[in-house]
């Protein structure tokens, strides 16, 4: 999580809407995902008391580890060391069997969409490449498409959604 600026940046705007305009924000989110009026329950962040901004974004799929076997499956699919996914907001929309997971990644401009994979060949890169290969095959994407550069963060979110769909979450 970057330090939050005074009135600028994607995270600042997301927090403003979630904190000061929650009803309208929830309405727009529920409308955007095709569930108008459905209730949304946003998860709280953890605390990081030793940081300049004392909140810690939810990381990876830690908020789902209460599901039997999910942590082991996730660790087999994706590296869980440094550089793991950080979510700007996580919530559940709907009730009961119709409940669906919401994962938010706020972006204030197109430049924020650009990123490269920082994983090393001796670290998590082989697992990431294997996950991308599986997802590309499933989606019918070109095998040679480069998902490790330029829009890596978007690609790793697509891989995460593929994993969650496969696990019926």
Predicted regions and their residues:
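Short beta-strand-loop-alpha-helix junction that forms the active-site gateway
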Residues: 106-121
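Active-site metal-binding core of divalent-cation-utilizing nuclease and nuclease-like domains
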Residues: 56-97
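Hydrophobic, Leu/Ile/Phe/Ala-enriched alpha-helical segments that form helix-helix packing faces
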Residues: 18, 29, 33, 91-93, ...
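Conserved catalytic cores of phosphodiester-cleaving nucleases, focusing on short active-site segments
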Residues: 89-91, 100-108, 157
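A structured, charge-rich N-terminal accessory region that forms the first stable segment of a protein
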Residues: 1-65
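Short catalytic/ligand-binding loop motif for oxyanion handling, primarily in non-cytosolic enzymes
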Residues: 98, 110-114, 166
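Acidic, metal/cofactor-coordinating or nucleic-acid-engaging core segments within structured domains
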Residues: 117-169
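Extracellular structured ligand-interaction cores
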Residues: 84-88, 101-103, 149-151
């Amino acid at each position: 999580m970057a330090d939050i600026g005074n009135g600028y940046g994607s995270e600042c705007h997301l927090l403003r809407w979630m904190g000061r305009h929650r009803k309208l924000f929830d309405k727009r989110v529920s409308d955007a995902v095709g569930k108008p009026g459905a209730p949304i329950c946003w998860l709280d962040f953890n605390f990081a008391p030793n940081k300049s901004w004392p909140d810690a974004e939810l990381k990876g799929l830690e908020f789902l580890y209460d599901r039997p076997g999910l942590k082991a499956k996730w660790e087999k699919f994706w590296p869980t060391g440094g550089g793991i996914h950080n979510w700007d907001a996580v919530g559940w929309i709907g009730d009961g069997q119709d409940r669906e997971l919401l994962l938010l990644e706020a972006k204030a401009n197109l430049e924020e969409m650009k990123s490269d994979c920082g994983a090393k060949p001796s670290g998590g890169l082989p697992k990431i490449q294997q996950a991308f290969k599986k997802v590309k095959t499933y989606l019918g994407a070109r095998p040679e498409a480069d998902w490790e550069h330029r829009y890596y963060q978007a690609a790793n979110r697509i891989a995460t959604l593929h994993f969650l769909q496969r696990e019926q979450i």
